[in-house]
Amino acid sequence: MEKHSPGDPASVRDMELKVSHCFIAVHDHDEALAFYRDVLGLEVRDDVEYDGMRWVTVGPKAQPDVNIVLEPAAANPNASPQDRKVMSQLLANGMLRAVIFATDDCDATFEQVCQAGAEVLQEPMDHGYGVRDSAFRDPSGNMVRFSQKR
């Protein structure tokens, strides 16, 4: 593969890049779907089984090109058994960061997610950088934040 220098016109910085997929580690696909689809209202984009695995993606209706892959922590086929064990332990301890969703109403979103029984990490609060946000844990222990610009 040819290597390009930073000043080369074919440099990535000159290209228009967009987020397509991001991954959230989960313990169980169905549990994760119950949260991301049923509580947060994300649409299921893919739910396909192949080679004994399951490929599940969800995303916001307003962002059809952005997909969140719900992937078991130990699913990476290139991971060693030790790596899989460590990933599973980090997930169980809530140490894997996840996602921040933008919302028009942080307080209303907070109330809806609370009513669904999600574990609250932070009630809505204003920050000096012009954002009001709140935080929860999803069923797998990932932090999920809801942010509203002020």
Named regions from a protein language model:
Residues 2-23, 43-137, 147-150:
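Vicinal oxygen chelate
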